[in-house]
From Swiss-Prot:
Gene3D superfamilies: Hypothetical protein apc22750. Chain B (3.30.110.70). It comes from Thermococcus kodakarensis (strain ATCC BAA-918 / JCM 12380 / KOD1) (Pyrococcus kodakaraensis (strain KOD1)). PANTHER family: UPF0145 PROTEIN SCO3412 (PTHR34068:SF2), UPF0145 PROTEIN YBJQ (PTHR34068). The lineage of its organism: Archaea, Methanobacteriati, Methanobacteriota, Thermococci, Thermococcales. Belongs to the UPF0145 family. It comes from the Archaea. SUPFAM superfamilies: YbjQ-like. InterPro entries: UPF0145_dom_sf, UPF0145_YbjQ-like. This is UPF0145 protein TK1926.
Length: 113
């Protein structure tokens, strides 16, 4: 189990050892991220050669982490202490611009006795 901004975050429907006592709603967080010219130049060069475009891999990893953080902050605003069923969605917004969206069910959980 991962904790982000003090919120338990899991991709499963339940958290082992905890029970859901209240559902607060959908927690969501998104970011639209663009590359900068330096990354684009390196990406073009790597694309010619083939293989992984590390500049874009790094950019998307950073975007996923920020989307997850924003989702956790939204869950806090909803009064939750956990988010279950966490999922990610991505889409291209434009050339070298991508949206990453994290969402899940914000819940209040209590430790099982």
């Amino acid at each position: 189990m991962e904790t982000v901004e003090g919120i338990m975050v899991v991709t499963t429907e339940t958290i082992p050892g905890y029970r859901i006592v209240e559902v607060k709603g959908i927690a969501r967080g998104g970011i639209v991220k663009a590359t900068h010219i330096g990354r684009d130049i390196m990406a073009v060069l790597r694309n010619i050669k083939g293989g992984e475009v590390r500049e874009y891999t790094q950019m998307m990893a950073e975007a996923r982490e920020e989307a997850l953080r924003r989702m956790a902050l939204h869950a806090k605003e909803l009064g939750a202490n956990a988010v279950v069923n966490v999922r990610f969605a991505t889409s291209n917004v434009g050339s070298s611009v991508a949206e990453v969206y994290a969402y899940g069910t914000a819940v209040v959980v209590e430790k099982e006795e």
